[in-house]
Amino acid sequence: MVELSGNIPFLWRLSPESSEGFCMVSMVVPFESEDEEEESRDLTIETSVVSFSSDSSRSEREEMLEWNQDDMSLFLKLVTYHQQGANAPAVESVRVDLTDPEIIDIIHVVAAAGFGTAYASEGILLDSVGRYPPHLCDLGSFAALNTVDGFKRCVVVDMDGEDVVGVLLDEIDVVSIGEYDKLDRHDLLMVKQTDLLHPDFATGLVRPPHATLH
């Protein structure tokens, strides 16, 4: 169990994956030993997120970047939700088990938010306006999307007016639209605020309260 806060210099490691500008993204947590004779060690958590750089010289060498405030805020919000529920107040530090699969998944989400490239949602989403009640969200909120492959979960990671970017928590089979086979977990999708539905829609268990079906 480790206590993490904004004072710890979390790092991203971008490791060249190909000569075409793609880099694999890993999280690095530096640990300094209090014993001067003990060698300091870093903890590295690999993710499935791929970053693309149009600057070929940058993509040819490993690069280390510090987490920014957006990274840390999203991480703390998602960890707090995981540990205490949706109505927990914002915190400045958390104690986490970095071997916990749920925490590792949160790290994937934060990496995707910072380095992923968003797909357009044209042809992937079904129209929900007037059929299902919209779900008011802010950054770090969970939502459901009504897709050609059923309701799928996502985390809101960017908002600009009506435009929203979500990190997918479920894969979407999109063979029917002909461009590619599927969108994977932790891919980014650009949607509209009116596309965001209550996350309970994606559980398949119950219909959210106040949901109207026509």
Label the predicted regions.
Residues 1-151, 171-185, 194-214:
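Mixed-charge, low-complexity intrinsically disordered regions
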